[in-house]
């Protein structure tokens, strides 16, 4: 498995709205993304700079992702995501090392998988693969396409 770099972390804050407001005050602008993600039963805020930070709040009891995240009562850092060269190979290696895959998130060009590494590392580990240098680059391309009235070519 080739880990390319630290990509982002997921945080389950005590108070989602206060966390997002304080983060925006800290960085001096609105977070890049703050929106419901009904397919995962979550409200999600994402900011790629200076370090990728994704906060989430479980909001709908309609799926396994909600159930899993809501059952985790601990607040704070939930998982750390590492960008990998090949998610399929990395997943096979993680499972061979005994870390169970908990979820997969296929989202267009972004492919993610979450593993149960909490006992060994103190947090869950997510591996992510995408064809851009950074997620910020992908969001910028999507924004340009949206402004031009086109579908994003991610």
Range-by-range predicted roles:
Residues 1-21, 25-26, 30:
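Surface-exposed interaction/gating patches
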